[in-house]
A protein has these predicted regions:
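RNA-interacting cores
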Residues: 1-179
């Protein structure tokens, strides 16, 4: 998951696997020498830490524990909402609940979707939400923001929805509950 610094630039990437990495994956991470972006200069990554969550001294904030989490990058629903028998199905809120059950094995007590104004204030509209070519983005091009509240604190990282493996749908723990 890419994480931006205070200026909004990605300055590090956290690679996370809930079940850990096998020896071949560790070798692949250790052998990564150069990254290239479209029209940019190469970046030379450095592996800083490798290990279990409980043994690492400093973890990125996204690995924190909280009962409240909120969107850092836009949540893109993996499915399009639809109307079946006069009832709206697969709303962004319903998909977040479903993904929490599937991915986290926890269902939030509440899912508070951000208003379009709040999502815009948080900069969620600045992300590219359409493919350059090929099939359209699942769930439509709308980017959503949300705040999740769980019954008990859970540990991150949390990334849900379309493109979660590329840094979309990332949530951060909320420490200060005075929103």
């Amino acid at each position: 998951m890419p994480e931006a610094d205070a200026r909004g630039f990605i300055d590090h990437v956290t690679v996370y696997a809930p079940g850990g990495f096998d020896p071949a994956a560790v070798r692949a991470l250790q052998s990564l020498r150069e990254l290239h972006g479209l029209g940019s200069h190469p970046t030379y990554p450095t592996l800083v830490a490798l290990g279990r969550r409980d043994r690492l001294e400093r973890l990125p904030a996204l690995f924190g524990r909280s009962d409240t989490w909120e969107t850092v990058t836009p949540f893109i629903p993996p499915r399009c909402p639809k109307i079946r028998r006069g009832e709206l199905r697969d709303t962004p809120e319903q998909q977040i609940r479903w993904l929490c059950r599937e991915v986290l094995r926890e269902e939030p007590l509440t899912v508070e979707m951000f208003s379009p104004e709040e999502a815009r204030r948080r900069g969620l509209h600045r992300y590219r939400n359409a493919r350059r070519r090929g099939a359209p983005v699942p769930g439509g091009a709308a980017a959503h923001g949300a705040r999740l509240r769980f019954a008990a604190p859970i540990a991150g990282p949390i990334a849900l929805g379309y493109g979660a493996h590329f840094g979309l749908g990332v949530f951060r723990p909320v420490i200060d509950k005075n929103f």
